[in-house]
Amino acid sequence: MRSFLLLLALWAIACAASAQQPLIFAAASLKNALDEVAAMSPAKATISYGASSALAKQIEAGAPAQVFISADLDWMDYLGQRKFLRSGTRKNILANKLVLIAPAGSSVKTEVAPGFPLAALLGNGRLATADPAHVPAGKYTKAALEKLGVWDSVSARLAPAESVRAALALIARGEAPLGTVYSTDAAVEPKVRVVATFPEGLHPAIVYPAALTSSAPESGAAADFLMLLVSAAARNVFQKYGFTPLH
């Protein structure tokens, strides 16, 4: 049944791609900014947002995406090692920051420092974060909390979400007292506030690589879209949403 549903989903995506090229698979945290950038493209792009891990697995399973934009290097490496990327097209386009957030009405205060009382700050609640088993934002969170020496105190008290935007929604709805997301996610959700920013040395650099997939032609709408991502106009949009352009 699962195989049938996956094939059905891939068929639906293929239909969308044939109608509106190119098909872009992009990390969920890019949605607001990338929607605005895509509006600049003369080609009508179909953009599917989700966890980088899930999108990479879909490409591996045959989804006809022509451009992949990941929220970490690992999942781009995963596809590259399996020959699902067009050689020579990969670019590191953006950087981001990891933040600790709370519902907008929360009065919690803390500094992110070794041994900080994260477990106590949660009270009887849980820490909302993207699933650290495979979603980039969750992996960055686990790495940071391990370096701070507090991971063991909260690892059994997570509210693991399928994507960073799903974790953001948990905090916005008040379903968890604290959570971790990217700074750009917090900036577009008025129902949350940033409690603290994690120093970048606590986790691997948060870098967004983009590349053509092996199913994309060397030139055409997909290649043009990839070039648009590093244009001056796109840089201005990404900066407006809090990303750090790397080109």
How does the language model describe each region?
Residues 1-4:
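Positively charged n-region of N-terminal signal peptides that target proteins for export
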Residues 20-63, 68-73, 77-247:
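Exported/periplasmic ABC-transporter solute-binding proteins
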Residues 6-7, 17:
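Cleavable N-terminal signal peptides
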